[in-house]
Amino acid sequence: MKKVPSDLEIAQAHEMIPIAEIAKNIGLGEDDIDLYGKYKAKISLDVLRKFNDRAMGKLIDITAITPTPLGEGKTVTTIGLCQGLGKIGKKVITTLRQPSMGPVFGIKGGAAGGGYSQVVPMEDINIHFTGDIHAVEAANNLLAAMIDTSILLGNPLNIDPMTVMWNRVLDTNDRALRDIVVGLGGKENGYPRQTSFDMAVASEVMAILALAENLHDLRQRLGRIIVAYTYDGKPVTAEDLKAAGAMTVIMKEALKPNLVQTLEGQACIMHAGPFANIAHGNNSVLADKIALNLADYVVTESGFGSDLGMEKFMDIKCRQSGLRPSCVVITCTIRALKMHGGLGNVVAGKPLPEELTRENLPALEKGCANLAHHIKVASYYGVPVVVSINRFTPDTDAEVDLVRKKALEAGALGAYPITVWAEGGEGAIELAEAVVAACEKTADFQLLYPDNLSIKEKIEVLATKVYNADGVVFEPLAERKIKQFEDLGLGHLPICMAKTHLSISHDPAMKGLPKNYIFPIRDIRASVGAGFLYPLAGAMRTMPGLGSKPAAHNVDIDEYGRTVGLF
């Protein structure tokens, strides 16, 4: 049997185009980019002013059904559709989040696609890239250090140490740092207090990077970060600590979007990487706006399912930026739909249960309730919906036909199998043609809720319409926080729900289409710099841990100095 090359082997065998040539192909000159070697570049923010008189392209958002822990190939679909649009002669750019090294060396892997649907240079993208995440880490941790210093040296801002909620961050999965004590060893080491580390991509600084419109906006947003409260209950901000200016300087280069390429030579603007289950889970506004000025079609991706990344794309990113999508593509796999129909227990790092590789039309039909709900959620926003079936070898024609039928019944314009992992853009031509047709339809874009609803009302809209709950229960802590935030004048902010990605509900064990349940809110927090409130539903970890067999075990260099084992 012929050996199937790994993602890394495919990427290493590929002859990349110099990034200056990729830039030229989309209309950028030497003065518009800063080279980071031969195959990576940063794009000057002056490009927005330079091309602001151009007609904007069509924005296509790729989302998904509720995934298994393995993921359903949303990034592969995003890149593959971009390549497919290129195959049919369209001027297209894809915009993606950049990966965090935590998942790269954990179980999930990187975020550069896979097979023949990848962006390159894959190794650089997955490890360090242009240093943006390190800048986020440095800016975040500078603020943390200034908080502890202020408390120790006279506490001029009257900060109550018990209210400090600004954690340090690290771009590594390290569970030992989830619950720690700092400031031990005497007064010269600081004021002892309990705290924790988060993943760098969980930092509000990362969310701010993704939502900032320009350098001035970045500076203002960083200044609005609430880090603690005084003994009198007043918020303390990064501006109060005189930290925001220095943080902005650290983040100045990171604000410039990164330019790389697909395996088939289309431009990819990869920038920012906030988590989708605890933040808003989308690439930067700047990346999308630059791409829309340079291409006729821009294919972007929202994290996890429509209940998380896509909802936040619409209700946070589009609300704040004025972006308007022309089409939504929902990615699904037959294996995941059968799992939602009651078959198998998919566990990250373990082989796929055998029953998910055999034809089972009754289980598939039952699981299609999950797909139908995601189509319904996307339809709330008045945008045409297309379904992409990421096809695997065991999938039968009968199964594909059933999914297509159910997608049409649920209101999608159509459902199209793709084979982009194996065939690149050639495997997405039918989908690409369908998406072009969908983009020609008139979208009647609308947000799910207006700004002037109360905090509770916004949460109730999300719970009943998106999470399919019968209602919401607010725990006492959440009730107190809601009153506090409304008293502070923050009630107008949109909601960024922190919940599991493995279920439409708050409970990862509730597969398919959960119903007849009450959605619980145990706490609510404010990311004022990013511009949203984030309620917590269920247990959420902001610092993952490594498993017994992390991906890091497989990564090494060979005798020629080449990376091996990176997927």
Swiss-Prot record:
Pathway: One-carbon metabolism; tetrahydrofolate interconversion
InterPro entries: Formate_THF_ligase (IPR000559), Formate_THF_ligase_CS (IPR020628), P-loop_NTPase (IPR027417)
Binding positions for ATP per the UniProt entry: T68, P69, L70, G71, E72, G73, K74, T75
Pfam families on file: FTHFS (PF01268)
The keyword Nucleotide-binding belongs to this UniProt entry's keyword annotation: yes
Any coiled-coil regions, as ranges: none
Reaction catalysis annotation: (6S)-5,6,7,8-tetrahydrofolate + formate + ATP = (6R)-10-formyltetrahydrofolate + ADP + phosphate
A Gene Ontology BP annotation from the UniProt entry: tetrahydrofolate interconversion
The keyword Nucleotide-binding appears for this protein: yes
The entry's keywords: ATP-binding, Ligase, Nucleotide-binding, One-carbon metabolism
Secretion signal span: none
Molecular function (Gene Ontology), one example: formate-tetrahydrofolate ligase activity
Catalytic activity, EC: 6.3.4.3
Superkingdom in the source lineage: Bacteria
Family to which the UniProt record says this protein belongs: Belongs to the formate--tetrahydrofolate ligase family.
Protein name (record): Formate--tetrahydrofolate ligase
Encoding gene (name): fhs
